[in-house]
Structures are given as structure tokens and as C-alpha cells.
A protein has these predicted regions:
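The feature captures the alpha-helical scaffold/lid subdomain characteristic of nucleotidyltransferase
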Residues: 3-69, 74, 78-89, 97-256
Length: 256
């Protein structure tokens, strides 16, 4: 009987702890993560977001230094507007860079990223598809999306990431090769770019972010997802451990 009571008390403690953990770290009242996520997985999401915040700071510093035009998009932009930072379950950073600035950005990232970070594209990674709409990524070398794979289940380096897309200007219209469904944005919707809070620093967003989000998601972007969808679409993450296959496929990144 004592054992049953003890187990029951332990269960109650776990439930209370998980609820408190769910409702911390967020600006959204009465928020809870998906029941699919364990306490450890929630902790890893938060640690991963903290690391990617540092990565985004480095990226932003380089862009500001070299006058490179960029702005956050997709879930990262929703996070800015609704949370002034991360959507609590988001698993990466999404952004656009002006096509005229991309070559300059590539060279700056190759030279100026700190130890532990790496610029990945088809030129630096033989496993990266040349025709990928995501033209490049900034990767953390000491972390892993445990369940994520490339096209057809192929493995490539999958440390925590900033996804880099490019946008183009054509006769006053803004084109997004990575999302051709967005056709109604003009230069006035993008410029002037705005500096806004993201966690403990500032990032760049477009001038009319709500028009972009309404076009991409409809009006539903402003409402919180159903509870069962509040988990990273990238799957499980480990903020502090490199995937084992990284050492085998990318010895040049780890043997110096």
C-alpha cells in the first residue's frame, strides 16, 4: 500500500512539474506544449532556442557590419510579432537575404563565423543539393536534429540551423523563389526594413509583416496552434551533442 501511495505521489509531482515547465519561458498566457513531448524534450527545445539565439546574433552582427539586407520570415516572423522572440516550439530560424547581397554574405560567413559555427551550401558541403530553394544554412557544429534527414532519407550535416533564402526585386514586385505562392508583395511592403526586439537583442523584419503572413498562412497565423501540433516539425533535437555520423561524413570540421 505504501508503495502505491509513493508511486501516486511521484506521478502527481511529475504532472505538476511538467505543467509548470510548459507554462514557463513564454509570453503566451495559459500555454501548454504538446503531450507528445517529454519534459526532457521540452528542455532541449529551450536549450536549442537559446543556442540559435546566439547564432542569430552572430549572423545579424555580420549583416549589420557589411550592410547586408535580410529579414525574418515564416515561423520566426510569427515569433517576433506574437512573442517578441521564439514561438515556444519552433525548431529553427527562417530568413530572407537580398539576392544582390548573397555573394557578399557567403564570403563574410565563411571568414567571420566563430568557432563552432559553419556556413553550409552546395559549395562547402558535397551532400547539400545544388537546386535547394534554401540556398544555404548557418549550422551549429555541436548539436543535432536527431530525426531529420535530407531528400530521400539521405543524411547531411544537421546541427541547429538558420535557413537562408533569397528574395528578388522585379519592377517593384518582391519575388520569393522559395515560396512562389507569395506574389502580391511590393517594395513598399518590404522597405524600410524595421529593427524589432527578439529575445534580448534586435533583428530585422519587413515593413508590412502582417500582409506577408496573411498571404502565406491566412488569418490563422495569429492564433495558437492546437495543442497536439505544438512541437518542432524538425522532430527531436539535442542542443549539446553532435550526431555521430557528423564525425564520419565531415572529418574536416572536427579534426582540427
Amino acid at each position: 500500500m505504501k508503495l502505491i501511495i509513493s508511486l501516486f505521489l511521484v506521478l502527481i509531482i511529475i504532472i505538476i512539474f511538467k505543467k509548470n515547465y510548459n507554462e514557463s519561458f513564454t509570453n503566451y498566457d495559459h500555454f501548454e506544449y504538446s503531450d507528445k513531448l517529454s519534459i526532457e524534450e521540452i528542455k532541449n527545445i529551450k536549450e536549442s532556442q537559446k543556442k540559435m539565439t546566439s547564432m542569430l546574433k552572430e549572423f545579424d552582427d555580420i549583416c549589420q557590419k557589411h550592410n547586408i539586407r535580410y529579414f525574418l520570415i515564416a515561423g520566426s516572423l510569427i515569433g517576433v510579432l506574437l512573442y517578441k522572440g521564439w514561438i515556444p516550439w519552433d525548431g529553427d530560424v527562417d530568413l530572407e537575404v537580398h539576392e544582390e547581397d548573397y555573394e557578399k554574405l557567403k564570403e563574410a560567413l565563411k571568414k567571420e563565423l566563430p568557432n563552432g559555427m559553419w556556413f553550409q551550401n552546395y559549395e562547402t558541403d558535397k551532400y547539400y543539393p545544388k537546386n535547394n530553394n534554401i540556398v544555404g544554412k548557418v549550422r551549429d557544429l555541436n548539436s543535432c536534429y536527431i530525426e531529420y534527414t535530407n531528400n530521400g532519407g539521405k543524411q547531411w550535416h544537421n546541427g541547429l540551423q538558420i535557413d537562408i533564402n533569397i528574395y528578388k526585386e522585379n519592377n517593384g514586385k518582391i519575388l520569393f523563389p522559395d515560396d512562389t505562392s507569395i506574389k502580391n508583395l511590393t517594395k513598399d511592403d518590404i522597405y524600410p526594413l524595421k529593427r524589432v526586439p527578439f529575445e534580448d537583442f534586435k533583428v530585422t523584419i519587413m515593413n508590412n509583416p502582417k500582409k506577408y503572413l496573411d498571404t502565406k498562412y491566412g488569418k490563422k497565423w495569429i492564433t495558437i496552434l492546437p495543442k497536439d501540433q505544438r512541437c518542432p516539425h524538425e522532430g527531436k533535437m539535442d542542443a549539446n551533442k553532435t550526431c555521430a555520423f557528423h564525425y564520419e561524413k565531415y572529418p574536416e570540421l572536427y579534426n582540427n
